[in-house]
Amino acid sequence: MRSKFKDEHPFEKRKAEAERIRQKYPDRIPVICEKADRTDIPTIDKKKYLVPSDLTVGQFVYVIRKRIKLAPEKAIFIFVDEVLPPTAALMSAIYEEHKDEDNFLYVSYSGENTFGQEGWVELPVDDMDKAFICVSAAKKHWVWVLCDVRSSYQNCVLIVPLVQRPVLHTHSSFLSVSFALLFV
């Protein structure tokens, strides 16, 4: 996603501002937060944030939710370099890994998972035709995963209500399953 902040401010000015902020507030992270294109989520009233370095991504999402006055039942997704960061990660770690060459961290938010999320996960399942796996997601929300083991484990769907790297619970043997995260 192209940053409007970058378009509106020359590189030298952005870099000087970020360096000044880091010198004055060494325990704060300079963050630019902008709404992603083509989303119906409200626009945030301010783009620049000085975030405590010990704040988690999940806590930052909470701040953004409050700033845009998003209803609790509505989903919000934040992206850093078009990737969903783990909600338990510290903003300082995300900053060190993803800061721009101007020393700002650029975060976009959306009401949809616009970039998708795919990957591999070890799912523990019993040896049966169909297995239900209980998953604990952010804030202890419980969801279920249905795997049709007769079709080479290709029909596994994980549905979680919030952005979160899932923690899987159950017993038995492990198997690798390709999955796509679908957010509701």
Curated annotation (Swiss-Prot):
InterPro entries, per the entry: Atg8-like, Ubiquitin-like_domsf
Localization of this protein: Cytoplasmic vesicle, Autophagosome membrane; Vacuole membrane
Physiological role: Ubiquitin-like modifier involved in autophagosome formation. With ATG4, mediates the delivery of the autophagosomes to the vacuole via the microtubule cytoskeleton. Required for selective autophagic degradation of the nucleus (nucleophagy) as well as for mitophagy which contributes to regulate mitochondrial quantity and quality by eliminating the mitochondria to a basal level to fulfill cellular energy requirements and preventing excess ROS production. Participates also in membrane fusion events that take place in the early secretory pathway.
Family named by the database record: Belongs to the ATG8 family.
Modification note: The C-terminal 68 residues are removed to expose Gly-116 at the C-terminus. The C-terminal Gly is then amidated with phosphatidylethanolamine by an activating system similar to that for ubiquitin.
Name listed for the protein in its UniProt record: Autophagy-related protein 8
UniProt entry tagged with the keyword Ion transport: no
Residues marked Cleavage (site): 116-117
Species name: Laccaria bicolor (Bicoloured deceiver)
Propeptide boundaries: 117-184
Any single GO BP term: autophagy
Lipidation sites (Phosphatidylethanolamine amidated glycine): 116
GO CC aspect terms: autophagosome membrane; cytoplasmic vesicle
Highest taxon in the source lineage: Eukaryota
Main localization category: membrane
Recorded topology in the membrane: Lipid-anchor
Keyword entries, A-Z: Autophagy, Cytoplasmic vesicle, Lipoprotein, Membrane, Protein transport, Transport, Ubl conjugation pathway, Vacuole
